[in-house]
Amino acid sequence: MMIEVLKSKLHCVRVTEANLNYMGSITIDEDLMDAANMIAGEKVHIVDNNNGERFETYIIKGERGSGCICLNGAAARKVQVGDIVIIMSYAMMDFEEAKSFKPTVVFPDSAMNKIV
């Protein structure tokens, strides 16, 4: 049996931009992506701690070291710059494998979105 489990999590990063006129997605600083074991094009679930919104989109690689967390397209309507969000991705795996799997969870400094 296959189940879906948490694979990666960026816990409490700050939204730096919201670009309604861009073609959808979330742009994430490449340093944060690497730390969380996330890749460009990966589907992510986003939770906004400030307003309770929950939505899905996919990742676009942002400039390394920039601290960028930018919601693009329609998702830009779900957040405000300065909001604190949690970004999660999931993986399908065998039930037995999932029992011992440990997700990558990253707690960046939310003031600057930097790895501490």
From Swiss-Prot:
Cofactor(s) needed: pyruvate
Protein localization: Cytoplasm
Q: Which residues carry this modification: Pyruvic acid (Ser)?
A: S25
Q: Where is the active site?
A: S25, Y58
Name any Gene Ontology BP term.
alanine biosynthetic process
Q: What is its EC number?
A: 4.1.1.11
Alphabetically list the UniProt keywords.
Autocatalytic cleavage, Cytoplasm, Decarboxylase, Lyase, Pantothenate biosynthesis, Pyruvate, Schiff base, Zymogen
Q: Which GO terms describe its molecular function?
A: aspartate 1-decarboxylase activity
Root EC class: lyase
- Sites where the protein binds substrate: T57, G73, A74, A75
An annotated GO cellular component: cytosol
What does the record's cofactor remark say about binding?
A: Binds 1 pyruvoyl group covalently per subunit.
**HAMAP family hit by this protein:** PanD
Q: How does it assemble?
A: Heterooctamer of four alpha and four beta subunits.
Q: What does this protein do?
A: Catalyzes the pyruvoyl-dependent decarboxylation of aspartate to produce beta-alanine.
What protein family does this chain belong to?
Belongs to the PanD family.
Q: What is this protein called?
A: Aspartate 1-decarboxylase
Point out the gene that encodes the protein.
Answer: panD
